[in-house]
Amino acid sequence: MIRLLNNFNFSEIDNADPAQWCRLFQEAAAEFDVLLSDAQLNRFLMYYRELKFWNSRINLIASAESVTDIVIKHFLDSLTLIPCIPFPDGRLIDIGTGGGFPGIPLKIALNSLKVTLLEASRKKVSFLKSLRRVLNLQDMKILNERVEDLITQAPCPNRFDMVVSRAALKLPEYLRFGKELVSSHGVIIAMKGANYQHELEDVNDILEEYGIFLAEVRSLALPCTGDFRAILIFRKSLSRT
């Protein structure tokens, strides 16, 4: 279990002291063995500011969320996936990315990652395209599309090394989509909370039908909040051989 950073208080540094903001964020990320350069830290700070600005116009995150909520529950929560990324320069798709989570934090931390963000909301896509320009992120595609429509395209886009999502998809539905998008050697990563075991029970009977298996479960606690997270890693069954 990850050590909790109960002494961190991001709410005291809301835009007033960018250097301190970056320092504290760097220390928190290091708890997950994520080392960030000054350029990466500045990108996260710019991301935070753009998120706050756009959130006053469109619903990207809850309007009442504090600086601590944004940094911990969105930025750092996304970065917890880094140890689970088997191909740092591979192709990753983020289904229902919303405000860019977890895809954009992963892209900032792993610059060689080739990221595709999938989002059905036009307003959110406008934000994502603006953010891509502001942060000068390369090798990042943004698709204004529903995953249901994407998987029906011909030929089926079975081309991603990693499929991730923080969207509110039930696990059976997410795996149904994920199996159509992931490559034969790739992984489907599900980010879940404390009730993940109940969701696993719902998919036990369909994993064989889908041709996938649960390869690994990683559990951790987010800093400051102590919120429990379970990262479920699925692979295609043929990768066992």
From Swiss-Prot:
Its EC number is 2.1.1.170. S-adenosyl-L-methionine binds at residues 96, 101, 119-121, 147-148, 166. This is Ribosomal RNA small subunit methyltransferase G. Keywords: Cytoplasm, Methyltransferase, rRNA processing, S-adenosyl-L-methionine, Transferase. GO terms for cellular component: cytosol. Pfam families: GidB (PF02527). InterPro entries: rRNA_ssu_MeTfrase_G, SAM-dependent_MTases_sf. It catalyses: guanosine(527) in 16S rRNA + S-adenosyl-L-methionine = N(7)-methylguanosine(527) in 16S rRNA + S-adenosyl-L-homocysteine. It is found in: Cytoplasm. It comes from the Bacteria. Specifically methylates the N7 position of guanine in position 527 of 16S rRNA. GO terms for molecular function: rRNA (guanine-N7-)-methyltransferase activity. Coiled coil: none annotated. It is an enzyme of class 2 (transferase). NCBIfam families: rsmG_gidB. Belongs to the methyltransferase superfamily. RNA methyltransferase RsmG family.
